[in-house]
Amino acid sequence: MTKNLLVELGLEELPAYVVTPSEKQLGEKMAAFLKENRLSFEAIQTFSTPRRLAVRVTGLSDKQSDLTEDFKGPAKKIALDSDGNFTKAAQGFVRGKGLTVEDIEFREIKGEEYVYVTKEEVGQAVEAIVPGVVDVLKSLTFPVSMHWAGNSFEYIRPVHTLTVLLDEQEFDLDFLDIKGSRVSRGHRFLGKETKIQSALSYEEDLRKQFVIADPCEREQMIVDQIKEIEAKHGVRIEIDADLLNEVLNLVEYPTAFMGSFDAKYLEVPEEVLVTSMKEHQRYFVVRDQDGKLLPNFISVRNGNAERLKNVIKGNEKVLVARLEDGEFFWREDQKLVISDLVEKLNNVTFHEKIGSLREHMIRTGQITVLLAEKAGLSVDETVDLARAAAIYKFDLLTGMVGEFDELQGIMGEKYTLLAGETPAVAAAIREHYMPTSAEGELPESKVGAVLAIADKLDTILSFFSVGLIPSGSNDPYALRRATQGVVRILDAFGWHIAMDELIDSLYALKFDSLTYENKAEVMDFIKARVDKMMGSTPKDIKEAVLAGSNFVVADMLEAASALVEVSKEEDFKPSVESLSRAFNLAEKAEGVATVDSALFENDQEKALAEAVETLVLSGPASQQLKQLFALSPVIDAFFENTMVMAEDQAVRQNRLAILSQLTKKAAKFACFNQINTK
């Protein structure tokens, strides 16, 4: 017979961003707890609101499965003394298992007998295991925790209630400073305390108290209500997924409504209005059928439709205050002079160990000069790049960005266009922040892409130079994200810029403000990001490509993909083994690898030398790999008919030189001796 288990923890208001991860974590840890305790179940459903985390297990076994375990002990010769009595070693072994020497049997393994005991454990009733759910709750981890009421323990928020029910059976358990009961709390304003009758009545018992415990149901309620408003007013409402997830974790009983604001605020840039609504007020944006922003918004109330008009007025009043700020800054910022703001950046600290933002911009500008040539920018693009690099951080000192920091770069674009700068300069100022996340949008323009790379490279090199290098998961200055951005942009634009050569060029630059240091660490850091971009590529293939001599990001990613693509083909293993053997022997070559045809002693030497001399890797990675694999028969014939490590030193070095020249060319693709063919 199966049972149903409910565990609910009632807390003070949780931060919206921790609700969903905590709910998921609770479900995963409950499943692990049940598995560890040999309790089978049909399904686990999790619940969450801003004031509760809960999990319900249905189809739960009414008892643990029985356990039979065999334990291997010492060898028989150690377990028995000369008189055939059990030694202390044998006695200690069985005692540790809760058994006696009478339980010992001997089993033969590979010609030798060993002590074995079998331990049988009868499964306990589920009621005996349920109290362990308290440990599951204690094991939950959170990004932040707090103390309260002078207690020594800490948790994400103060705990108010604990409910643990096995069907209708209530468990009186203690958790932190709370004693368990079947009492749960309803909606803070509309509901009251209520008793959960059974594990299966949980949602309905709370629904009567204006709490929708299932987040999926709350989400659907919000979406349906928004769609209803759309249909009623003939508008389009942007249901942003992240905003929706945040809003549903701010309410226990959602009611969506539409408010409005004065159309005069539409003269302010749309980005300012959208930021005010979405980021600051958690409102959904409303547009007409053509996508034009309307002077309306959608908000979601934590409650029902009672006195909704008052709620709408309150939300409108709060939003207008934000929009007034935006309108004021938009008007006042246009009076500022860009060159004056750039000069003031001399007094803004980039980092206390690195210097000012202006110094950061100057270094970035010098990097853009190198990159412009390597990226093949036109004369006009180079001019636009130079101008953008000279001013691109100015908007950090505007009133708008000071109030709405999410708009940095965006407002820079707006203000530069108003000041008469070219669209390319303006776009680059916006795009230099991209990407803002691991999978974020990339720059579209070449000028913006180069400025983004240059800005990120100086950031990375500057922090590394003063010893602020990420370690473990600690990366307070987001240098991994910056490096990932550099790698992604280079790959997206297909620029054949060798990162090792570029970094060498950067370290050769001279600045008054800073000297770049720790080049080796920077190179390893960049390679680690390329490694990450290779995703699920097998580790040995990643290592082979990363160990190669070609550090053009696009080429490396293409090479890894090509190797994975052919790794299941018949000729992959023998071809890689041939090249790998060449790589291993080539390491023994001394000095400059020059080949003297006069020292050839067989046709196979000559054939390989000629094949290497004419080898020019070209085309896509798949084609280059075919070129290399085509050498496999020639390499094999060479090894079958040639003693590479000949006694004659000149002959030996000549043969190693052939292999050295081969591997030098092949290494532009990958170091094949890093690939595992076993």
Curated annotation (Swiss-Prot):
InterPro entries named among the record's database cross-references: DALR_anticod-bd, Gly-tRNA-synth_bsu, Gly-tRNA-synth_heterodimer
Predominant place of localization: cytoplasm
Pfam families assigned: DALR_1 (PF05746), tRNA_synt_2f (PF02092)
Catalytic activity as recorded in UniProt: tRNA(Gly) + glycine + ATP = glycyl-tRNA(Gly) + AMP + diphosphate
Record-level GO BP terms: arginyl-tRNA aminoacylation; glycyl-tRNA aminoacylation
Origin superkingdom: Bacteria
Nucleotide-binding keyword on record: yes
One Gene Ontology molecular-function label: glycine-tRNA ligase activity
UniProtKB keywords: Aminoacyl-tRNA synthetase, ATP-binding, Cytoplasm, Ligase, Nucleotide-binding, Protein biosynthesis
Name of the protein in its database record: Glycine--tRNA ligase beta subunit
Gene name for this UniProt entry: glyS
